[in-house]
Amino acid sequence: MMLKQAAKKALGLTSRQSTPWSVGILRTYHENVIDHYDNPRNVGSFDKNDPNVGTGLVGAPACGDVMKLQIKVDEKTGQIVDARFKTFGCGSAIASSSVATEWVKGKAMEDVLTIKNTEIAKHLSLPPVKLHCSMLAEDAIKAAVKDYKEKRVKTNGAAAAGETTQA
């Protein structure tokens, strides 16, 4: 204890001030991450059986993050009219999900496939150790679009089969 007090005195620190080496230990999030974590946009879910809803469920075994991102598509225009997410994970994963749902709304499905994890990471100023969170968001978008397209094929195939059996 004496050594610690002597070091603080030598450094000109009072007992209430942090030591300079403790400052480097603290990790802070960028204000965009904090904003999307404290005020996440589009939290929730749609009925996964709705033919106009695509669901992407992805996870990162390394850290335990799991992300479900859903899109609701206007079948006439092919435009994403709404999006929802549920994420179990760190603040960066939640923020990445929130940003992804904001960015996909109002866009055509083909356009959202161009959203890259690097853009999400840059927007949130994610450190390299958190890049996997933005990768999950990109993967969830792709998985949701794929799920929607597969549903449309099944729905259209079933409708076509119904038409041929009635003819």
Curated annotation (Swiss-Prot):
Pathway named in the protein's UniProt entry: Cofactor biosynthesis; iron-sulfur cluster biosynthesis
Required co-factors: [2Fe-2S] cluster
Source species, domain of life: Eukaryota
Targeting signal (transit peptide) range: 1-50
A Pfam entry, by short name: NifU_N
This protein's record includes keyword Transit peptide: yes
Cofactor: how bound: Binds 1 [2Fe-2S] cluster per subunit.
Protein name per its UniProtKB record: Iron-sulfur cluster assembly protein 1
Lineage, top ranks: Eukaryota, Viridiplantae, Streptophyta, Embryophyta, Tracheophyta
Gene: ISU1
